[in-house]
Amino acid sequence: MANPEHHVFEAMLEGWKKQQDSRGLRAVTIRRRLSVVRRFHDYTDKVPWQWTVADVDEFTSEIVANARALSTVRQYHNALHMFCEYLTDPLYDWMDICESEFSQVPAQVCLPWNTVSHKYEFEGRATRRPLTYEEVQCLFDTADERVDTLINSGKKGALGALRDAQLLKTVYAFGLRRTEAIMLDVADLHHNPQLKQWGRFGALYVRWAKAAGGGAPRRRTVMLVPEFDWWIPGMQQWVEQARERFAPGSLEALWVTERNTRLSAGYLDRRFSEIRDEASLPSNLTLHSLRHSYVTHLLEFGYAERFIQEQVGHVHASTTSIYASVSSDYKNRVLAKALKSLIEGEEHDR
């Protein structure tokens, strides 16, 4: 057989692909993982049964030098770790095949002490933070002023500006991720049996939540909290009046464009950045900062962490705690309340 190393390597990749297919992982996830393994193979110019821990260290240094985010490095490490795990699993024959054909066997080269996941609990940038209440209000005021300006000037785009303003408010009022927001359909507006006066604006059924482990998108219902009931009139106006003026026809998307299509994620990012800059807010604030703001503000309102975790769809409570960044005013209120209870308790004991 010509170049047996190449044929065995390709067979390994094909076998790993089939294993992931059988687990129901998304095709895009599988392609991304295979691409990482091929890239590592090309970088080392070695076949898997020749890989070493030092190869991973050098590869990591290379991608970090190219200013890759820590989350990207972690994804690379995870892909390599899972591939090596597959090769060294005794349920498969790769160890026996390699020993028989090449007198070497694959080994796990991604270990706890040379991977990002072991070193870093939080991989976000230190400059990322939630918006304060004042910044949220400033952002929404600027978005609303866009609508008024376009209406008063007689220029086109007022309906689109109204849609954009309500979309940003929805991201904040429900703590949504970007994809979760743009993939909403009109049918995803739901009632809250406890607050019938809100009609179908009491909850959102999120069908495109972040997938776990490369599987299908998860689903959850996010309840509107009373502190954000200001969201209802604007949403009612969009759904019952403004949206129909885009002539969506049979299109089920909640957020439609002038061309009768669903809004894109890229558009939402760009529009947030434009409105943020118009509002003279810090450039390090991103659309995802609104989701961080939601978690922080619900915590300051006094909601239980478990409730907040369910609302935002976090698998682990630790992720929710990372999102939270309570204000100094909130900390002072909590401290004042604790001191008051302590003083009252001491006076009662006298």
What is the role of each PLM region?
Residues M1-R350:
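Conserved catalytic core of the tyrosine transesterase superfamily
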